[in-house]
């Protein structure tokens, strides 16, 4: 892959949604917020909860714009680094003054669960009797750490992590805007590496696209750039399970380990393919769906292997590898969980 100049603007900023209709996968939240704005039912405090990279801060900024708040009346604070009582006192002093040129002063506080106990106590007093011209938007990845007395005074929205289908569409659309086309299995790998985060998916895709002048990108190129386990090793594991070839399976695990592959990711990739193999063996009628998810060569490989799979490919096999995925990383030997799974399913 040939190196090219770095993009002028990082993807997660370049493609950050600017209006509600650009927000992906959070229709349940957008609909409520749009309705509230239309009716003029504005809450004095919102609490956005969800995993990292799901769009909480982006939606907070969109909401502030939809409320007609200009930059001079928008205040953002990261509670991870501004978590003390003095930081909250400065907010309490600020809220008493009227907006410069907007109807509302909006305060976006990210990672709000990081506030200290004293800071929470001080902030609660402001939440109990907020000025009419102030709107707080709190964002957190750990809502269980937010005091119930605060949660009860906020309108709470839970952001859902995007599923694989949403992330794959997301990858395809951004790649298209950048003038690239990714093979289906390359799209799948980028989405898997994104791990339920739009921001992480942005970063991985940017890394891939900025490393090549090729307009058509294969899975192998994504593997080379990201250091993901090679698809051949995943195929070797599948064959070892179906054909009951333990040495082949253990060899694949060993090769992945030697290349410093992330065993959690390796097991996840194996699970993705085992599921497809299982569905093909059962003749569930999902052939077309699976064909859209993988490359033509991979679909041919899976179809052929499924025809050879009897009782060696059952639901219990999938369950055993799910357990291996959950167990990976619990010991100082990363590959152990996968090795044990293979010895259990290959008799």
Locate the predicted segments by residue.
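Extended, largely alpha-helical regulatory/partner-binding modules appended to the mid-to-C-terminal parts
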Residues: 54, 60, 87-90, 139, ...
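P-loop/Walker A NTP-binding region and its immediately flanking N-terminal helices
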Residues: 1-156, 162-166, 172-174, 254
């Amino acid at each position: 892959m040939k190196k090219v100049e770095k993009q002028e603007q990082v993807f997660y900023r370049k493609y950050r949604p600017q209006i509600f209709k650009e927000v992906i996968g959070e229709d349940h939240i957008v609909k409520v917020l749009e309705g509230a704005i239309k009716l003029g039912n504005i809450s004095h405090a919102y609490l956005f909860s969800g995993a990292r990279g799901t769009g909480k801060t982006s939606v907070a900024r969109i909401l502030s714009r939809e409320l007609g708040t200009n930059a001079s009346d928008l205040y953002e604070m990261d509670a991870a680094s501004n978590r003390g009582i003095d930081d909250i006192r400065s907010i309490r002093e600020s809220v008493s003054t009227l907006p410069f040129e907007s109807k509302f002063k909006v305060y976006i506080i990210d990672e709000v669960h990081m506030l200290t106990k004293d800071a929470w106590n001080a902030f609660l007093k402001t939440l109990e009797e907020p000025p009419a011209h102030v709107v707080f938007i709190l964002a957190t990845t750990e809502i269980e750490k937010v005091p119930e007395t605060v949660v009860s005074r906020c309108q709470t929205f839970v952001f859902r992590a995007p599923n694989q289908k949403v992330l794959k569409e997301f990858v395809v659309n951004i790649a298209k805007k950048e003038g690239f086309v990714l093979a289906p299995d390359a799209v799948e790998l980028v989405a898997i590496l994104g791990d339920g985060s739009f921001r992480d998916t942005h970063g991985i895709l940017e890394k891939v696209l900025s490393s090549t002048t090729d307009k058509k990108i294969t899975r192998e190129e994504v593997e080379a750039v990201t250091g993901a386990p090679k698809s051949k090793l995943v195929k070797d594991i599948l064959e070892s399970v179906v054909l009951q070839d333990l040495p082949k399976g253990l060899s694949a695990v060993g090769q992945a380990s030697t290349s410093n592959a992330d065993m959690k990711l390796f097991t996840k990739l194996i699970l993705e393919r085992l599921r497809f193999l299982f569905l093909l063996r059962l003749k569930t009628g999902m052939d077309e769906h699976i064909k859209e998810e993988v490359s033509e060569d991979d679909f041919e490989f899976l179809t052929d292997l499924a025809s050879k799979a009897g009782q060696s490919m059952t639901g219990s096999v999938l369950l055993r590898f799910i357990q291996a995925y959950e167990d990976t990383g619990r010991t100082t030997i990363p590959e152990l969980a996968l090795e044990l799974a293979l010895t259990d399913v290959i008799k």
